[in-house]
Structures are given as structure tokens and as C-alpha cells.
């Protein structure tokens, strides 16, 4: 049976990947973000995949937080652009570290716009077809900081479908949706292994991404991950 990780286990698995298997943060972030882009493309295909017809592209608002989840979002945005989408980044609190600065710089050179103000519910409905939620990961602890209140309000009130990376933002990593959080993504992309909160996910699509977990680590934690089909970077869980 597929294992769902609690917060301590998720942190420990990450530490083992970094310290024992010598993966770098940017290496795992690239693989994770790429798998997220593939999951998005499966669930929300753009009519203009593979061509430059900007007018017909699926417009995606990628909301990035200050940590690794936000970095995954920046990578995801870059790959979505290469796949025929038109991503726009909302990055309210950029991280002043070379890794994140470089990821954002790459997006800028690929002509991916970054907006400085969170759009209203009405503005978002007019401008975007999809929102990628890359705000908070499994290290999140409430309350939500003031920098992210407006985007959290947008994601809870919008009718636009939302794709959440690893953890729906504002959810408890183990207990799921908290009383003051109404965020209900249509797509959840669990990374490495699903977290306990994913058991409370009621959306339409649940995918697993991050095809990089060594077999010995899978056995050590009895993860029982599903087999990825062929050369796929993500696998559907439900």
C-alpha cells in the first residue's frame, strides 16, 4: 500500500536525499518542477502546445512562495512556457539566494512576465485559465504571513482551477484543510511521496511527481511508490 508521509518523515527523506545520496537542491528542484509541468499538461492541455501562437495559449498564473515550493513553481513556469503555455509569475517575497535569483532570471530571459501586485478575483478570472499554487510546502506552519494574505484570498475565492504543488497552501501537512482555509485545488501534484494531507484531497486529479527516489530509500521507508509508466515523469494516483 502506498505510504503517506507525516511532516517529520517528509523532512527526513529530503535530508537523506541531500546528505546520503548527495542530490543538490537545484537538481531535485529541476526534476520536481519539470514533473509538475508535465502533470499540468496532462490535466489542462494547452491548445497551442508546440507552436508560437500566443493568442491561443493557456494562460497560467504561477504563484511562488519564498522556499523550495516556490522554486519548484519557478521551474514549472519555465517548462510550461516551453510546452506552449503562457505563464505569468506572482512572486510577492523573492528569496535573496543565488539559486532562486537564477531561476527567476531564467524565467525573465524567457520573456515570462512577473507581476508585482496580486490580481483581484475579477482580474484573475479575466486574465488566466489556471493558477499554479507553489506558495508553501511541507514545512509550512500557520499563520499565513501578511505578504501572502492577498494571494491566499484569491486562491480561496476564485473559480479558476488550481494546481497545487505537493501541499495545497494553507493546509496542515498532516491534517489537511484547516478551518480558516477554503483552498480546494483541482489538481494536486505530490512530490517524492504523498503527504498525509493528501488523504483529504477531494479534487479531480492527484498525480505523483519527482521520479528520482532511489530504490534503497523506497525500501527503507516502505514507500511502496507506484511504477511510473514508460518514460513518464509523473504518475496518476487518482
Curated annotation (Swiss-Prot):
One MF term in the entry's GO annotations: metal ion binding
Enzyme class: isomerase
SUPFAM superfamilies, alphabetized: YjeF N-terminal domain-like
One Pfam family it belongs to: YjeF_N
Residues involved in (6S)-NADPHX binding: 68-72, 137-143, 166
Family: Belongs to the NnrE/AIBP family.
Name of the protein in question: NAD(P)H-hydrate epimerase
Organism this protein belongs to: Drosophila willistoni
Amino acid at each position: 500500500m502506498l505510504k503517506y508521509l507525516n511532516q517529520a518523515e517528509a523532512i527526513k527523506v529530503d535530508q537523506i536525499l541531500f546528505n546520503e545520496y548527495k542530490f543538490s537542491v537545484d537538481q531535485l528542484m529541476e526534476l520536481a518542477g519539470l514533473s509538475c509541468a508535465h502533470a499540468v499538461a496532462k490535466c489542462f492541455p494547452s491548445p497551442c502546445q508546440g507552436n508560437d501562437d500566443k493568442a491561443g495559449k493557456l494562460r497560467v498564473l504561477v504563484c511562488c512562495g519564498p522556499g523550495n515550493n516556490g522554486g519548484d513553481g519557478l521551474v514549472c513556469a519555465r517548462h510550461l512556457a516551453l510546452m506552449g503555455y503562457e505563464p505569468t509569475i506572482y512572486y510577492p517575497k523573492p528569496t535573496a539566494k543565488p539559486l532562486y535569483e537564477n531561476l527567476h532570471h531564467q524565467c525573465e530571459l524567457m520573456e515570462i512576465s512577473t507581476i508585482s501586485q496580486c490580481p483581484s478575483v475579477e482580474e484573475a478570472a479575466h486574465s488566466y485559465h489556471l493558477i499554479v499554487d507553489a506558495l508553501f510546502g511541507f514545512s509550512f506552519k500557520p499563520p499565513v504571513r501578511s505578504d501572502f494574505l492577498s494571494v491566499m484570498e484569491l486562491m480561496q475565492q476564485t473559480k479558476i482551477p488550481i494546481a497545487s504543488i505537493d501541499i495545497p497552501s494553507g493546509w496542515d501537512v498532516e491534517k489537511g484543510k484547516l478551518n480558516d482555509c477554503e483552498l480546494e485545488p483541482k489538481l494536486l501534484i505530490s512530490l517524492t511521496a504523498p503527504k498525509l494531507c493528501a488523504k483529504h484531497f477531494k479534487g479531480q486529479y492527484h498525480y505523483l511527481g519527482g521520479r528520482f527516489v532511489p530504490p534503497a530509500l523506497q525500501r527503507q521507508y516502505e514507500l511502496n511508490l507506484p511504477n511510473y509508466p514508460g518514460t513518464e515523469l509523473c504518475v496518476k494516483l487518482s
